[in-house]
A protein has these predicted regions:
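Generic, well-ordered alpha-helical scaffold segments in large soluble proteins
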Residues: 19-24, 43, 47, 68-75, ...
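Amphipathic alpha-helical packing elements
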Residues: 72-94, 180-216, 447, 452, ...
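Short, small-residue-biased leader/transition segments that mark boundaries at the very start
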Residues: 1-3, 7-14
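C-terminal accessory domains/tails appended to large, multi-domain proteins
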Residues: 290-298, 303-475
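Short, glycine-/Ser/Thr-/acidic-enriched flexible segments
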Residues: 6-8, 26, 33, 57-59, ...
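Conserved phosphate-handling catalytic cores of large alpha/beta enzymes
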Residues: 68, 72-80, 85-145
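Cofactor-cradling patches in redox/metallo enzymes
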Residues: 18-24, 28-100
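Active-site loops and adjacent core secondary-structure elements that bind or stabilize anionic groups
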Residues: 11, 112-338, 342, 363, ...
Length: 475
């Protein structure tokens, strides 16, 4: 028997791996999400587990995985440890996790690999050769990581700031929103959001790679993709009819100005009271002919004397999703339990797309005549961006807290942030709205110690805290 528990931080697709293993006669103990290390290890002992599995969706999960590995070593565990989830990689497992635990630590890239890995680890004849091969692979991964040179040279924070994106604030008038303040969208019908669904990531979540709609005609996976597409649409039909899932969202548009790499948000147009400071990070590698981008560059600097504004949003496509998934599981229908999660994830993303369009055309109103097809929306052929904390342009997750505080998200629509700043329900999107026509997405990528210190100071964090939250952007 394999007793596998899910990691103590939220993960989407948490049931995929379990389903695949159960179908191959492994017994699974799924502890759910946000479970402490102590509970994981205590349960593993109680049930006589053969393997422990951890899965993580967002970057803070990575630190927790390291902590679990260290605790397993300290407490003398002899079980293999499986690592998986969206934020994990073979390199991270080899460099950060594996060296903290004497027993096998194996990165599982997808659910389909899990059975072979588990069988190899539990078969006394297969295990020695399998573990030796993994050890060799990790040694190579660590060596490659150590020798990896950044593609471009790092520069000091002062140098990066001197090379900021210089926008013409003299000849440009930032558009004033038609509707300032916070607005709630308590129950947007599924029928409104369906046309905004981007289906390509849906197929990817089922490990079917291909662009929609071409994937439906694919010689190899077209038939499977078509069946899955039909099932997803049947589920959407059902959600439209029975209204068992609620899609709720909230937006806010506020007076704001840039101050260095931060953005001040004001209580009203007098701009005398700062209600929140948003902290951003700047690219810190040498750029040939390009600026060192930072999101704060896209809001008029305070010293320009130009009034500007910023938006914030949070949406979920999954209020009620958990109960439906649990009901399917209780009925031993794992396929539909996973399908409802995948469909609600798509609804959340569609909601973010729909609401951003409404903001551009109506609430902020700087593009009232915009008329784009869904394909054009997916390609982002519009003015402005909606970067999300935790993603490359603003990779630090605790900034979600500012969105929650500015909008009163939890009180208004019930969406919560966990201790690791993951969003609940899991089918959720949150972020910022920038209106500047030159605003664009970019990756902050690797930053240097001087920026970490500066960020810690701006955020009121200790250096250790800042290093923890900025971990993926440090060498």
């Amino acid at each position: 028997d394999l007793h596998r528990r899910r990691h103590s931080f939220p993960t989407r697709r948490s049931s995929d791996l379990g389903v695949v293993l159960q179908c191959n006669n492994f017994e699974i103990v799924d502890l759910g999400v946000m479970v402490s290390c102590e509970t994981i290890l205590k349960t593993a002992r109680e049930v006589g587990a053969d393997i422990i599995g951890l899965s993580g969706l967002i970057t803070p999960s990575l630190d927790e995985m390291v902590h679990v590995a260290k605790e397993m070593e300290r407490q003398g565990f002899k079980l293999p440890l499986l690592i998986g989830g969206a934020t994990t990689s073979k390199a991270h497992t080899a460099v950060k996790i594996e060296q903290n635990y004497s027993e096998p630590v194996v990165y599982v890239s997808n659910a389909s690999r899990a059975v072979g890995v588990a069988q190899s680890l539990l078969n006394p004849e297969l295990k020695p050769a399998f573990v030796a091969r993994i050890d060799k692979e990790y040694e190579i991964a660590r060596d490659q990581h150590a020798r990896k040179q950044p593609r471009s040279k790092p520069v000091s924070l002062a140098h990066a700031r001197a090379n900021r994106h210089q926008l013409d604030w003299v000849g440009y008038e930032p558009p004033k929103p038609r509707e300032l303040g916070v607005q709630t969208f308590e129950d947007v019908p599924v029928s409104v959001l369906r046309p905004y669904i981007d289906w390509t990531p849906f197929f990817l979540s089922w490990e079917l790679a291909g662009k929609y709609p071409r994937i439906l005609e694919d010689e190899i996976i077209g038939e499977e993709a078509t069946k899955l597409f039909a099932d997803a649409n049947a589920m959407l039909d059902q959600l439209e009819q029975d209204k068992s899932v609620r899609c709720a969202g909230i937006i806010g548009l506020f007076p704001a100005n840039g101050v260095g790499d931060s953005i001040e948000v004001y209580s009203d147009e007098s701009r005398t009271e700062v209600i929140k400071v948003l902290h951003h990070l700047r690219q810190q590698s040498e750029k040939q002919g390009f600026p060192n981008y930072c999101l704060a560059d896209y809001v008029a600097p305070k010293e320009s004397g130009k009034p500007d504004w910023i938006g914030a949003f949070a949406v979920t496509g999954g209020i009620g999703e958990e109960a439906i998934a649990q009901a399917y599981k209780a009925d031993h229908d794992d396929y539909n339990a996973i399908l409802i999660q995948a469909v609600c994830d798509r609804l959340a993303e569609a909601f973010a797309e729909y609401l951003h369009e409404q903001v551009r055309k109506v609430h902020w109103g700087y593009a009232p005549d915009e008329a784009l097809s869904n394909e054009e929306l997916i390609r982002e052929n519009y003015q402005g961006i909606r970067p999300a904390p935790g993603y490359p342009a603003c990779p630090e997750h605790t900034e979600k807290g500012s969105i929650w505080e500015l909008l009163g998200v939890e009180q208004a629509i019930g969406m919560k942030l966990t201790e690791s700043y993951a969003m609940w329900p899991g089918a959720a999107v949150s972020g910022w709205y920038f209106s500047h026509p030159e605003s664009k997405y970019f990756a902050v990528a690797q930053i240097q110690p001087d920026q970490v210190e500066d960020y810690a100071q701006r955020k009121g964090m200790t250096l250790v805290e800042a290093e923890r939250w900025l971990g993926p952007n440090l060498n």
